[in-house]
Amino acid sequence: MAIKDWPQGEGPREKLLRSGVAQLSDAELLAVLLRNGLKGQSAVSLARVMLTHFGGLRALFSASLSELCDIQGIGPVKYAQLQAAIELSKRIAQENLQRGKILSDPDLTRDYLMRQLADRAYEVFAILLLDSQHRVIQFVELFRGTIDSASVYPREVVSLVLEKKAAAVIVCHNHPSGGAEPSHADRRITERLKYALATIDVSLLDHMVVGDREIVSFAERGWID
């Protein structure tokens, strides 16, 4: 049954307006973005098919155009709608953490990093550069691929920090597997970076590992001091 044929007030858009966006399921939120489904299949039903096919939102939003088009009813238009929604979310986070903003709210940092890295299908190691007052200078993605102690080069991190005249940094990387629990390699990388940055009198404030739905902070676990 198409959404337009549902009883009045039961569609996802009506539910959003009546009860708030937080009350919608993943499939209902996705249906609002899709706007319509197929003949005889509602947008919510199509959304459920997509979520089942990809195994969740993260993999779905990381899918390429060709991968999405494997699903009947999905083409370039719906792909563009989904990509626009992702990019808007990232730009909102970017505005919240723009250059010159004092980084005093850990939740703001977490939100920004989650939006930037959680949907990546590959590992990204990045650095948030701060001045002496912990104002944001720049967010830079340094390395991509398999992130381990052999693929993250402290000298490149130090070079960037010196170039940008940063006084403190927060490093971060994502786990495409979805889990945020740091590995032994993550801890080794952190120790190497902490030592390298100390030689130029720059503070490593934190190393954050981004998973599907959570972020683990080295500082909060006492692994930075």
From Swiss-Prot:
Belongs to the UPF0758 family. It comes from Shewanella loihica (strain ATCC BAA-1088 / PV-4). It comes from the Bacteria. Zn(2+) binds at residues 173, 175, 186. This is UPF0758 protein Shew_3481. Residues 102-224 form the MPN domain. Signal peptide: none annotated. GO terms for biological process: proteolysis. GO terms for molecular function: metal ion binding; metallopeptidase activity. A motif (JAMM motif) lies at residues 173-186. Keywords: Hydrolase, Metal-binding, Metalloprotease, Protease, Zinc. InterPro entries: MPN, RadC_JAB, RuvA_2-like, UPF0758, UPF0758_CS, UPF0758_N.
